[in-house]
Amino acid sequence: MSCLMVERCGEILFENPDQNAKCVCMLGDIRLRGQTGVRAERRGSYPFIDFRLLNSTTYSGEIGTKKKVKRLLSFQRYFHASRLLRGIIPQAPLHLLDEDYLGQARHMLSKVGMWDFDIFLFDRLTNGNSLVTLLCHLFNTHGLIHHFKLDMVTLHRFLVMVQEDYHSQNPYHNAVHAADVTQAMHCYLKEPKLASFLTPLDIMLGLLAAAAHDVDHPGVNQPFLIKTNHHLANLYQNMSVLENHHWRSTIGMLRESRLLAHLPKEMTQDIEQQLGSLILATDINRQNEFLTRLKAHLHNKDLRLEDAQDRHFMLQIALKCADICNPCRIWEMSKQWSERVCEEFYRQGELEQKFELEISPLCNQQKDSIPSIQIGFMSYIVEPLFREWAHFTGNSTLSENMLGHLAHNKAQWKSLLPRQHRSRGSSGSGPDHDHAGQGTESEEQEGDSP
């Protein structure tokens, strides 16, 4: 069947009138819709542009042969097996709130600005739809639906797309993590030092970036993608590979859903670029870059939040804090996140062992204990950033609360260290594994949270 490439939005328009279909080929988002009854299929890692790149690029004297592509796609099949079935297996209808839990979920939403908000309980009460339910509520609470004249049905459709593009089989990088980061971002946007300067656009950007910052995460870090010569690593030339993919996936879904199609073109382009800047800031490999800039601004007292660029920088910092705030939650929730992220690390280690690859730092369950990983992550990544955030907020109640939880949780993990490690502290998770212990999206292995 012949097809005509169209530049705008990466669309493919089929010339055959009987197959009047539109295929949106943005990276991270492919769907086929038409009158032929073909069921929509979302395949985050199979964009058309990726195949072109693989088939036309030479690496280490190797041409993109069919054999090489087949080897690369074998890793994709491993990661996305369940996702490839989404277009085949009918899905149960999505219910925002199960009737049995409606009252409890609504009660929780009334306290969504509290730092002890239990996202795990909320996810259960919403029948696994915590991200969609939370974002719909926050968009309404912040007046974004009215201000930007958003269609509620279209907003819901977009949020469902985002939620479904997270991999539920990932212990850590899943839609619940996205909801947790979004709830944290909501709390940070309410900080008095920041809130009085924020525009509706700032708030919408912050919430959207938080919700989609890890979309279509494969459950492995950037070094893994590089050493397996994954097509995404080739596409982004080993630079912020996962973050770039999250951003492009988000833009693809925004365009497909047409959530912002009624806004001026210049405005939507600006939104897309700012979303990219925010999501790319979560690359743990850029931690020192942002921390140094923040320290300099605070030392020089030259932050002018009336200025859009300075506000955007603080939104980047807020998102970075939200992304790695797990150690600053109450122990019961922080511990769950720590166990989840380490389980994801260990799974990567098992995969590397299976394919006879060198096991990445923090991914060897026999050598890297959860306490040592978490202590290193807190010491090298979390504490430095949150101390500066507290400085920015003027040691607000929330900042003091977070630092208190952080100190308590670190002490808890130290008490759980294997005896032979206690005298010399943690075995060292440095800013190595992405997030040093978490992550890096670029390492991302959690950069995300410990």
From Swiss-Prot:
Annotated catalysed reactions: 3',5'-cyclic AMP + H2O = AMP + H(+)
Every PDEase domain range: 97-420
UniProt-annotated binding residues for a divalent metal cation 2: 214
Activity regulation, free text: Inhibited by dipyridamole, IBMX and SCH 51866. Insensitive to zaprinast, rolipram, and milrinone.
Keyword tags: cAMP, Hydrolase, Metal-binding, Phosphoprotein
Tissues in which the protein is found: Highly expressed in brain. Also expressed in heart, liver, skeletal muscle and pancreas.
Record GO terms (molecular function): 3',5'-cyclic-AMP phosphodiesterase activity; 3',5'-cyclic-GMP phosphodiesterase activity; metal ion binding
Pathway in which this enzyme or protein is active: Purine metabolism; 3',5'-cyclic AMP degradation; AMP from 3',5'-cyclic AMP: step 1/1
Compositional bias annotation for Acidic residues: 441-450
Single biological process term from Gene Ontology: signal transduction
Co-factor remark: Binds 2 divalent metal cations per subunit. Site 1 may preferentially bind zinc ions, while site 2 has a preference for magnesium and/or manganese ions.
Residue positions binding a divalent metal cation 1: 177, 213-214, 323
Phosphoserine: modified positions: 426
Region feature (Disordered): 418-450
Cofactor: a divalent metal cation
Domain of life of the native organism: Eukaryota
Homology family: Belongs to the cyclic nucleotide phosphodiesterase family. PDE7 subfamily.
PANTHER family reported in the protein's UniProt record: CYCLIC NUCLEOTIDE PHOSPHODIESTERASE
Function: Hydrolyzes the second messenger cAMP, which is a key regulator of many important physiological processes. May be involved in the control of cAMP-mediated neural activity and cAMP metabolism in the brain.
UniProt-recorded name of the protein: 3',5'-cyclic-AMP phosphodiesterase 7B
Organism of this sequence: Homo sapiens (Human)
